[in-house]
Amino acid sequence: MARTTPIARYRNIGISAHIDAGKTTTTERILFYTGVNHKIGEVHDGAATMDWMEQEQERGITITSAATTAFWSGMAKQFDAHRINIIDTPGHVDFTIEVERSMRVLDGAVMVYCAVGGVQPQSETVWRQANKYRVPRIAFVNKMDRMGANFLRVVEQLKTRLAANPVPLQLAIGAEDAFTGVVDLVKMKAINWNDEDQGTTFTYEDIPADMQDLAEEWRSNLIEAAAEASEELMEKYLGGEELTEEEIKAGLRHRVLTNEIILVTCGSAFKNKGVQAMLDAVIEYLPAPTDVESIKGILPDGKDTSAERHSDDNEPFSALAFKIATDPFVGNLTFFRVYSGVVNSGDTVLNPVKDRKERFGRIVQMHANKREEIKEVRAGDIAAAIGLKDVTTGDTLCDINAPIILERMEFPEPVISVAIEPKTKADQEKMGIALGRLAQEDPSFRVSTDEESGQTIIAGMGELHLDVLVDRMRREFKVEANVGKPQVAYRETIRSTVEQEGKFVRQSGGRGQFGHVWLRIEPMEPGGVGYEFANEIVGGVVPKEYIPAVDKGIQEQMKNGVLAGYPIVDVKVALFDGSYHEVDSSEMAFKIAGSMGFKEGFMKAKPALLEPIMKVEVETPEDYMGDVIGDLNRRRGMIDGMEDMTTGKIVRAQVPLSEMFGYATDLRSQTQGRASYSMEFLKYNEAPSNVAQAIIEARKAK
């Protein structure tokens, strides 16, 4: 089967935004104008096509990034058909992992901002992730029809809050109820969309007389931005010559692709204005798979030799699985992005991360939650496979004869855990299956068993994250469960260096046990590898076959903690001396000696308890400012700063996670429901001694 759309006409884009910027409505309109959806789905009624989990429709927030394919030939049918693959990304901070993994497989992004609320705290998190993966992006300022909408104020905030270099491509004509259309600064024409056919058709008109000067001013800003793309354009511009429309667009495209500028468009998705022109901007300014760098990876040859793949059908097949979803009808759906080559349904490929072969049973292309079966996928495509057995998010799938491991995604460690048990014995097994499925879908969600109590523990990125998962278990797997009180993931560490002997001797008749080691235990830089073992034995005083056993004994003790039973981090241990017995020494004896030595040494090396600190941002009306700050101080918060917003203030603080439980309810009652907050993990800090003491005693009492 030949390629139907040339790869240069592909656009793999994400639509990313703060919770209420109107992202889902914007995506809905895209699907409507590209002719996929004939009835526009409204989030207000909980019927949007992209939000396909029941919960998302109920809560009105987008949780999973659904992938959808659409075609667009331009507002005036001025292009050949372009294939746009859209990954919808969530805007809630507990789901940052979803944003991170979608950024990884995108070539470009559309950032949606609310014309009233502007750049909100959550937008910064998404922005940082887009920077991390160097994703070229354009902005769409939505909700121009709302009270208090102000396009140029949002442009200014992109500069001040995100340190971006925004260049408006359009200006809004009017605002609030008087918002009628946009000025296209490249063509210097006003665009008016037809209300009768929901904005499918439009007319170019003259720019309103009262906007002519403003339009001239912003057009010269746009042309200057385009001219900076190359020396030739700059010379022409400085020489006073007019740049042609083609030259302006080529210059702007070059600067968007190199991440030098962010083009800003505007409109009101709800009122069917502006999304159409934003789609044209996606085609004209965002990259095709061939415009971005080739994908880097390593060969699974044990030497980590670096390798790369280009967006080309003739290169060996390589793809990245970026999301696993459980589907009610077919089981696991593995969403993947093809970076190179071609794969057909029925082909067998390699998962080099797990060194397993996988067969592509059926390949489907998703349109929100409707699916269409296809026979093959090619470089640049995004699709889902049914029936892959052992693939986790971030795994590579590739040609068996040309193995490569593509750059993996890094997932944060969970910071909050709760005990969970099924309401009835009959649900025990069902709960196990459900949790297993959910953990496979979401790498930032972990399931484990507490060895002492036998309870099942689930851990994740925040209270909302775990709520949503427990809720999904109830709906999708019909498992009712009781959830315990949230527990914080504390860690233990040391602050000074000690040398400690560890000796395990049992010699009373029969085969004895003898293990003897000397360890040097020292603190390491926080946030690094977490643990390092150094073998400094000289002259075989401890035979080399016993050395891994010492390391293993130390690691087991680290997992179980010493102070209060929490995992130990940021410690380097060197084995520098010891002795052995010809007959009685064994791996077991050295493992116990290592563990004993480490445990004793740890308690002498100024042990400390670490607690997770969260970055908290609260948006509040000014009247409640004092209460909010007072409350954060009571929660041992450290205020980082404040910022003015149109609707009040943003307070930024660092607060220990243990103090943040139930914060949503408290904040609601303090501010009569008018404030909102977001919170994400920042770092581990040493807990104050009174707090640490209370935690240690509570653990011992158990």
From Swiss-Prot:
GO molecular function: GTP binding; GTPase activity; guanosine tetraphosphate binding; translation elongation factor activity
Family annotation (PROSITE patterns): G_TR_1, G_TR_2
Signal peptide positions on this chain: none
Keyword entries, A-Z: Cytoplasm, Elongation factor, GTP-binding, Nucleotide-binding, Protein biosynthesis
Family annotation (InterPro entries): EFG_II (IPR041095), EFG_III (IPR009022), EFG_III/V (IPR035647), EFG_IV (IPR047872), EFG_V (IPR035649), EFG_V-like (IPR000640), EFTu-like_2 (IPR004161), G_TR_CS (IPR031157)
Domain of life of the source: Bacteria
Main location: cytoplasm
All copies of domain tr-type G, residue ranges: 8-290
Transmembrane segments annotated in the record for this chain: none
Annotated compartments: Cytoplasm
One GO CC annotation: cytoplasm
Family the entry assigns: Belongs to the TRAFAC class translation factor GTPase superfamily. Classic translation factor GTPase family. EF-G/EF-2 subfamily.
Function: Catalyzes the GTP-dependent ribosomal translocation step during translation elongation. During this step, the ribosome changes from the pre-translocational (PRE) to the post-translocational (POST) state as the newly formed A-site-bound peptidyl-tRNA and P-site-bound deacylated tRNA move to the P and E sites, respectively. Catalyzes the coordinated movement of the two tRNA molecules, the mRNA and conformational changes in the ribosome.
Protein name: Elongation factor G
Species assigned in the record: Photorhabdus laumondii subsp. laumondii (strain DSM 15139 / CIP 105565 / TT01)
